[in-house]
UniProtKB/Swiss-Prot annotation:
Molecular function, one GO term: metal-dependent deubiquitinase activity
Domains as described in the record: Binds double-stranded DNA via the SANT domain. The SWIRM domain does not bind double-stranded DNA.
Family classification: Belongs to the peptidase M67A family. MYSM1 subfamily.
SANT domain: residues covered: 33-78
UniProt-recorded name of the protein: Histone H2A deubiquitinase MYSM1
PROSITE patterns to which the protein is assigned, alphabetical: MPN, SWIRM
Lineage: Eukaryota, Metazoa, Chordata, Cephalochordata, Leptocardii
Domain MPN positions: 592-719
């Protein structure tokens, strides 16, 4: 954003709005009556310098746009402070003070769930009452001087563009907790110790009018609103001296706070005398909400709520007895009173409810009970927990999942359990609910197949420990690895498999979450919210053009398949190549006989190291029967790097001398693949080919042996051994010859030969540019000869006549 662009800092009505770009392709239509400047201002008070959160709060701007505007906003704010002569430091970056300001602002405005701010709403309220409210709110937070806010008058009704009213949910009335009133002026003084990150003294110009709501109406996008239960008229009991007194308040702190607040008392009274508060709207709002509470309580099962409340109270009394007792003294003294409606003189009965605040800071809603009967108690829905408690929806859902997760505890088995292969017990149905709830992919038959396969594998490998990765090799299309692992863990805990093994896990067994609702929102709402977030994070080419100041360059999107094909031709020396067995069609050039002593030496050498080992093979080659006899194996030192293995030249010489002294000649080499398949790698094939060429000069064969001692997919404890030799036969290469007589690139009259001759003539013409006609004739003769050579080679096999013209050349 340009530095010289005019930005609405003071809130004038005729100033341009935030990001007021007509041509911006990303600029969505703003909410009716909600100006982005006002949304940014109050979004900053709630979220601090979190531009992503503010952008989601505004809903029509991306985080990058919000960040650019904030940078320009604070830069202009510094210039304004300097021009006014103020020497207070303004925090521009807001790394530390912004976070402190948000915490102070949340706790001061009553956003802390442990200490809510209760505000009275009397018809005869004056500036003194406002000062008492400020004193009660800021009593526990001396870092802020005062916070004076009066939201007791409801603004005008919001309508759509066609003049129709928005429908209102009959259960709650959405109100912003920070909502300013256009019928009154307010003064907000926010001072943070050490800096003024969010602090400023704002009067008429700073506060923008917000479209209000009346009963049965609301503004668009109700998910932006939070229900304020504290906006109800709370009536103080007889004998109470103060509106609200927190459990940790003291008289000295109250006196100091009252002294600081009195400095702005005169200014507040003057501003409030300019516009009187209309209390009728509040009474109307109270009537509607009280009726909604009655309908809500009648529609909910009282027995279930009684049990939930009883459990919650017992939990609070046990875990937080001290805090709950002290807090109850401050909270239980307030009665929610539904006073007589002045607009309806006939109403005589006044409904009274006792407001009981939950003692735990994690309580999601306030609890209301009938003070007269004292029988039924109800919890209001958790509408106001997102902003007040400072927890996100993801944290709330994660906490719910942790609470709902259950475990099965099994006793340590004393003897091996033998299960009937055709019967599924009730315990298995309870533990593995996912296979018995009617799913198409997970059926009881599939569960039996997985369980019986694990039991069969255990019968073959006992008493060795059976790992689930080994058993999974024999299960194809039988479910995901998680469900196989859960069945393996269950059988292990009851003693059906891995009985007597030290590696067996006997701890708690988690139950698969079947039917647990991970997100409290509906599926449609969740998809809509996710789509809105993705849309807000999308950056178009037009926006990039505006940011960079020029035309954006769009790079072509390369397909994943193209990159995969290019990488497939790269040289990988560690790629394993499967071997091809000899058959009757391609018999082995000679037979191999290995002595048991040599095989024991190779296997023992491979077992003592997790890295690759290497050595030489000694034996005799019998030419008449064409048999190679391997009688001895000599281990050698290796130059292993963990990824490859090479033989030490000094050790190789010593091993060759030892085999010669024993009367054997070198007939091969061996090495190990500790944990992967005994297939040769590309590097092994190169080494084997090199050795075969050396020994083939003397007419002797040369073989290679690969041993795999620790196989992760083999159930048997025996090592896997592969004996290989490189065949002299090569597969014919793929046909890549170009058919010169075929059409070139879809042209009807041009062949590949015509294209080749035309290209050659261009080179010859440039070389004979300064020559005479004799040079041109020689070039034409050369092209004719080239055409005849290629044409004859193709026509001899196809029996056709080439159709190629050189007249134009």
């Amino acid at each position: 954003m340009a530095d010289d662009e005019e930005i609405d800092i003071e809130g004038d009505d005729d100033a341009p709005l935030l990001f007021d770009h007509k041509d911006d392709a990303l600029a969505l239509p703003d909410l009716p009556g909600y100006e982005p400047n006002w949304m940014f201002d109050h979004g900053q008070e709630i979220y601090g310098r979190s531009w992503t959160s503010i952008s989601q709060f505004v809903q029509t701007r991306t985080p990058l746009q919000v960040k650019n505007y904030a940078r320009h906003f604070f830069k202009t704010k510094v210039v304004q402070k300097v021009e006014e002569g103020e020497d207070e430091d303004v925090d521009i970056e807001g790394e530390e003070s912004g976070e402190e300001a948000v915490m102070e602002l949340r706790s001061t405005c009553g956003l802390n769930p442990a200490q809510p701010a209760v505000v009275t709403s009397d018809d005869t309220s004056t500036g003194e009452n406002v000062m008492e409210e400020t004193e009660a709110v800021t009593e526990d937070h001396p870092s802020l001087d005062n916070l004076v806010q009066d939201d007791r008058e409801m603004p005008q009704q919001e309508t759509t563009g066609d003049g129709e009213q928005y429908p209102m949910d009959e259960h709650f009335l959405p109100v912003f907790p920070w909502q300013p009133d256009d019928t009154q002026n307010r003064v907000i003084v926010e001072r943070i110790e050490g800096s003024v990150g969010l602090g400023s003294v704002r009067g008429d110009k700073d506060v923008r009018p917000v479209p209000g709501v009346e009963q049965n109406t609301y503004g668009p996008h109700t998910d932006m609103f939070q229900v304020q239960n504290t906006l109800l008229a709370f009536e103080k009991q007889v004998g109470a001296d103060r509106i609200f007194e927190g459990p940790s308040x003291s008289k000295n702190e109250a006196t100091d706070t009252q002294t600081e607040v009195s400095e702005t008392k005169t200014e507040v009274i003057e501003r409030q005398t300019e516009s009187q508060v209309d209390a009728t709207h509040m009474h109307t709002y109270g009537d509607g909400l009280m009726g909604s509470i009655e309908r809500l309580t009648e529609s909910v099962s009282s027995s279930e709520l009684k049990e939930d409340l009883k459990t919650g109270i017992e939990y609070v009394e046990k875990d937080d007895a001290t805090d709950s007792s002290s807090t109850a003294k401050g909270y239980d003294n307030y009665t929610l009173d539904h006073p007589e409606d002045r607009s309806k003189p006939d109403s005589v009965v006044s409904e009274k409810w006792s407001c009981e605040e939950a003692m735990s800071s994690h309580t999601d809603g306030r609890t209301f009970s009938d003070s007269d009967s004292g029988k039924e108690t109800y919890d209001l829905p958790r509408y106001n927990t997102t902003i007040f408690q400072g927890h996100s929806e993801d944290e709330t859902s994660d906490a719910g999942q942790a609470e709902e997760e259950t475990f099965f505890t099994f006793k340590k088995p004393t003897e091996e359990v033998v299960l009937d292969r055709s019967v599924i017990t009730e315990e298995e149905k309870e533990v593995h609910k996912e296979f018995f709830d009617g799913r198409q992919t997970k059926t009881p038959e599939r569960y039996l197949k997985i369980r019986n396969h694990l039991l069969d594998c255990w019968e073959r490998t006992k008493p060795e420990y059976l790992r689930k990765t080994v058993a999974r090799a024999g299960l194809r299309n039988c479910g995901d690895v998680n469900c196989i692992g859960r069945i393996h863990g269950y059988l292990e805990r009851i003693g059906a498999i891995n009985f007597g093994c030290e590696e067996a896990n006997r701890g708690e067994f988690p139950v698969a979450k079947v039917g647990v609702k991970r997100n409290p929102q509906g599926h449609g709402e969740q998809l809509a919210l996710q789509a809105a977030r993705l849309e807000s994070m999308h950056v178009t080419s037009d926006e990039l053009e505006k940011q960079d100041g020029g035309v954006s360059q769009i790079r072509p999107n390369r397909s994943r398949a193209a990159r995969t094909n290019l990488n497939s031709f790269s040289y990988d020396p560690f790629k394993l190549v499967p071997c091809k067995r000899f058959s009757e069609e391609s018999p082995a050039p000679f037979s191999v006989k290995i002595h048991a002593t040599a095989l024991v030496t190779i296997d023992m050498h491979a077992h003592i190291s997790t890295a690759e080992v290497i050595g030489l093979l000694g034996g005799v080659f019998h030419r008449d029967p064409g048999a190679l006899e391997v009688a001895s194996a000599e281990p050698c030192n290796s130059l292993s790097t963990g990824m490859q293995c090479e033989m030490d030249p000094v050790s190789q010489t010593q091993a060759s001398e030892a085999l010669s002294q024993a009367g054997y000649s070198v007939v091969g080499w061996y090495h190990s693949h500790p944990t992967f398949a005994p297939n040769p790698s590309v590097r092994d094939i190169e080494t084997q080919t090199k050795f075969q060429e050396w020994f083939a000069q003397g007419g002797s064969p040369f073989i290679g042996i690969i041993v795999n001692p620790y196989s992760s997919t083999r159930i048997s404890p025996l090592s896997r051994v592969t004996c290989l030799t490189i065949s002299s036969e090569w597969n014919p290469p793929a046909i890549q010859r170009v058919k010169l007589l075929s059409r070139y690139a879809g042209h009807t009259d041009t062949t590949y030969m015509d294209k080749m001759l035309y290209s050659l003539s261009g080179h010859l013409c440039r070389g004979n540019a300064d020559s005479d006609e004799d040079g041109n004739s020689e070039s034409l003769t050369l092209l004719t000869d080239i055409r005849d050579i290629f044409a004859n080679s193709w026509t001899s096999s196809l029996g056709t006549t080439p159709r190629s013209s050189i007249a134009s050349l």
